[in-house]
Amino acid sequence: MAPVGVEKKLLLGPNGPAVAAAGDLTSEEEEGQSLWSSILSEVSTRARSKLPSGKNILVFGEDGSGKTTLMTKLQGAEHGKKGRGLEYLYLSVHDEDRDDHTRCNVWILDGDLYHKGLLKFAVSAESLRETLVIFVADMSRPWTIMESLQKWASVLREHIDKMKIPPEEMRDLERKFMKEFQDYIEPEEGCQGSPQRRGPLTSGSDEDSVALPLGDNVLTHNLGIPVLVVCTKCDAMSVLEKEHDYRDEHLDFIQAHLRRFCLQYGAALIYTSVKEEKNLDLLYKYIVHKTYGFHFTIPALVVEKDAVFIPAGWDNEKKIAILHENFTTVKPEDAYEDFIVKPPVRKLVHDKELAAEDEQVFLMKQQSLLAKQPATPTRTSESPARGPSGSPRTQGRGGPASVPSASPGTSVKKPDPNIKNNAASEGVLASFFNSLLSKKTGSPGSPSAGGVQSTAKKSGQKTVLSNVQEELDRMTRKPDSMVTNSSTENEA
């Protein structure tokens, strides 16, 4: 710092007063020293307070629980691609006060236990103290929650044991985590509303803080690292109430068991919903709070059943016992799987896939079936009746439906479908009528015509009667000579 004073002295000599007082030089040197000291202090403080790199988040959960979707949403991406084995992504962390950025590594283990050996690539003995663990539970399938949490907690415990961390170092991690758990203070009491969104925590002196004793079943499974239990798909609670008849008692029973599990591991509990974007920002803030020590001013939330938040260190058995007041058909000590029963699996009846048969083969089969069928009486009786209508003139008239238009002056009754056909009478009438058509004979007043009409009335076949009447009307319109010749032939 001496050269600074010398430089000032030389500058003051030629341009200012010729001689400077000794007292003035001393004060200027002190100001220069304090200026440099403040600059060096600020630089060193920034270096120490820079956001550390190498922080890790390890995520466990069943397949389909939504763990990848959850972390992708926290990352800020709309759609994430699900990987296989061990997925990797990162969370961007920004310190607004110091305008500093860093990335937090996120490792997502596959739901198949076959891939648990990949954990060695995500967390090592050196990086364990920089790791936060998230257990993801699927609230849309609450009957799998406790079994899943126990399974993944065992996998993590097994992996930590395989690291062969020195016992002294492991005990140091456990003591540090237990102290953080015991030193929890309500945000409204301890962190009086910092207006910043995030900021570094200022820890008080150890002399002022008095650690509260741990209760029963609290931190019985101390892993030495922070743990967070995240329940996803909490918007499915309404579906559980409608389809599975869940009541508030069921939801309180689930929450009570989750909170007891969290007490054993010193974990926090948070209900989320990516679909409704519920508690996602809260989850992000709590993660950076536990990982980087940022300010966190949100207290515990237990009012809304689908937006519960229990920070680590806040809960105890007395607070959990409040949920027991709503129990009517279940006891707090009842087994989880005895009350939250897995619904019976509905067997889906899949229609067998049938290959389309070749069209020609299908038609051949139908032809063979028709050939094997015996001829019915209806077919034999109908064939002669269609004989007269086969003539070009009668066929063109369209059958019985066109009779009224052929002879407007003739009133013919419609055939009665209730009268049974007389096969013998039809045959006689058809043959006689064919002979009349071939010879072009017949008279309206002849006995034969009268006989035909009387026979038609006796047989009750209105269709044949209408055809006869139609032909008689046609023949009456013939020339008189044709009528006279036909009458002579009939008499002969």
From Swiss-Prot:
Keyword annotations of the record: ATP-binding, Cytoplasm, Cytoskeleton, Dynein, Methylation, Microtubule, Motor protein, Nucleotide-binding, Phosphoprotein, Transport
Residues recorded as bearing Phosphothreonine in the entry: T441
InterPro entries given in the database record: Dynein1_light_intermed_chain, Dynein_light_int_chain, P-loop_NTPase
Chain positions recorded as ATP binding sites: G61, E62, D63, G64, S65, G66, K67, T68
One GO CC term, this protein: kinetochore
The organism's place on the tree of life at top rank: Eukaryota
Residue numbers of Omega-N-methylarginine PTMs: R397
Compositionally biased intervals (Polar residues): 370-383, 437-469, 482-492
Signal peptide residue numbers: none
GO terms for biological process, alphabetical: cellular response to nerve growth factor stimulus; centrosome localization; microtubule cytoskeleton organization; microtubule-based movement
Residues covered by region (Disordered): 188-207, 370-423, 437-492
Keyword Transport: yes
Pfam annotation, one family: DLIC
MF terms in GO: ATP binding; identical protein binding
Positions bearing Phosphoserine: S194, S383, S391, S443, S446
Ranges in coiled-coil conformation: none
Compartments where located: Cytoplasm, Cytoskeleton
Bias kind Basic and acidic residues: ranges: 471-480
Role of this protein: Acts as one of several non-catalytic accessory components of the cytoplasmic dynein 1 complex that are thought to be involved in linking dynein to cargos and to adapter proteins that regulate dynein function. Cytoplasmic dynein 1 acts as a motor for the intracellular retrograde motility of vesicles and organelles along microtubules. May play a role in binding dynein to membranous organelles or chromosomes.
Record family assignment: Belongs to the dynein light intermediate chain family.
Assembly: Homodimer. The cytoplasmic dynein 1 complex consists of two catalytic heavy chains (HCs) and a number of non-catalytic subunits presented by intermediate chains (ICs), light intermediate chains (LICs) and light chains (LCs); the composition seems to vary in respect to the IC, LIC and LC composition. The heavy chain homodimer serves as a scaffold for the probable homodimeric assembly of the respective non-catalytic subunits. The ICs and LICs bind directly to the HC dimer and the LCs assemble on the IC dimer. Interacts with DYNC1H1; DYNC1LI1 and DYNC1LI2 bind mutually exclusive to DYNC1H.
Name of the protein in question: Cytoplasmic dynein 1 light intermediate chain 2
Species annotation: Mus musculus
